[in-house]
């Protein structure tokens, strides 16, 4: 590597990115077409310890975008989406103070319309009486 950052730093940045990925429900990553996942470098100026980034495409709000999830010093996340919406306009929302258990819901909110997600979180159950 031509970077001056020691390998141990890269390893811990990769662990941070992997931890974030594990905190996002797999169905959320699949539904937004998450691909080209990578880790983010720490940024003392922004008080960011590292993070996860990935591309998304063909969501109900976003045609194509890059998502950045940054781990902040206060142990919350900042989620940035930078891309193009379905009307081909610039789309750059930010959510701050996101806790790990909120990541899936926040990503759904940033990438999908309410109409698209209204049935996703409601389990459909049919009760059948078994005679025996």
Where in this protein do the model-derived segments appear?
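Negatively charged, low-complexity tracts enriched in Asp/Glu with abundant Ser/Thr
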Residues: 2-61
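Mixed-charge, Lys/Arg-enriched low-complexity segments
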Residues: 2-8, 86-132
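Short, Lys/Arg-enriched charge-dense amphipathic segments
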Residues: 59-65, 111
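Hydrophobic transmembrane signal anchors and adjacent membrane-proximal interface regions, especially
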Residues: 27-30, 67, 125-130
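Surface-exposed beta-strand edges and flanking loops
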Residues: 56-58, 71, 81-83, 129-132
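Intrinsically disordered, low-complexity regulatory segments enriched in Ser/Thr/Pro
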Residues: 63-98
């Amino acid at each position: 590597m031509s970077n001056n950052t020691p390998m141990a730093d890269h390893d811990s940045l990769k662990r941070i990115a992997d931890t974030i990925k594990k905190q996002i429900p797999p169905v959320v990553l699949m539904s937004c077409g998450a691909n080209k996942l990578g880790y983010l470098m720490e940024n003392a100026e922004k008080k960011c310890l590292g993070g996860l980034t990935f591309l998304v495409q063909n969501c109900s709000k976003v045609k194509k975008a890059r998502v950045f999830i940054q781990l902040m010093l206060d142990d919350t996340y900042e989620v940035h989406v930078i891309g193009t919406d379905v009307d081909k306009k610039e789309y750059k929302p930010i959510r701050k103070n996101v806790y790990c258990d909120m990541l899936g819901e926040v990503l759904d909110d940033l990438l999908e319309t309410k109409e698209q997600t209204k049935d996703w979180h409601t389990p459909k159950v049919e009760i059948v009486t078994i005679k025996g």
